[in-house]
Amino acid sequence: MFEGLYGLSCVENQVLAFLRQQRVEVAPLYYNSAVPLKELFFFLVIQGIRPVYFDRVRRIQDDLRERGILAFEKRNEALSFWLDRADDGSGPEASLILVTPAFTAETLMARGFRGDHYVRLLRRNQDWVIQNDIPDREVVLPLEELEKAYAGSGFCIRLCREPDRDDVRFFWSSRTFKPENHTAFWFYEQDLDGVPDVGSRLRDMTGIYKQLRYRTAAYYETHGLNTTFIWKKGAEMERIYALAEYYNLKRSIPPSQFFSLLNEIARMDNALMSELRMKLGG
């Protein structure tokens, strides 16, 4: 359900999955994903901004709502409101509901980086179905368990129209981060001096980084570029992210190893973005 989708939050993943169900091509929506590594490092490591508050890339649902493509409204309602709206997932509307942290951890086995977690609510025959993004799974719940899991709010989503050529051109012209302007960036060991909780911050940065580079590859593919060279680095990006998570959990890592990991990311990213710049004529 969520394979090949690169949202930066559970809600964005759900929106992307809904759009794909509606046969909307989602890759053009990743237009502003080529955030330079130095900006990711500054905001997520130096400043310590949590991924949930990272706003250098605007959320896709906000872009689409502003363009009149998507109706997206948060509602604080009784569970009965969402039960009445639920369908089998084939229609032009969707309901996301907030679930409790206990349900998120114990039933969904999800480990998010924020306290609130949203899932899609579906009705299939007489069953209530919860659709989760990460891990990608569905859970069938009796009503009494759903009542315990529900945490009091949700989002109403409706596709108003499909993105058209004007939207695609608008997204291209609205890019803040243009790979054709890429300049190489390297780290210095003293960049980490005085940074608290380096392991957690570096884990957050690498998690956002890999998602954004996947999005970048998907976006520029829609503009006729061969971005296989980025996709081929997917396994390496996942390995670096796993290593950053290991360093975070171990909590006894010397600064030199964090610096080594940063340089590994920089070497890879400079090569990727330089090639993308060349393909774009920069």
Give the location of each predicted region.
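Intrinsic-disorder-associated interaction segments
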Residues: G4, L8, Y53, T176-F177, ...
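Generic structural signal of hydrophobic/aromatic residues within well-ordered alpha-helices
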Residues: V15, I60, L64, W82-L83, ...
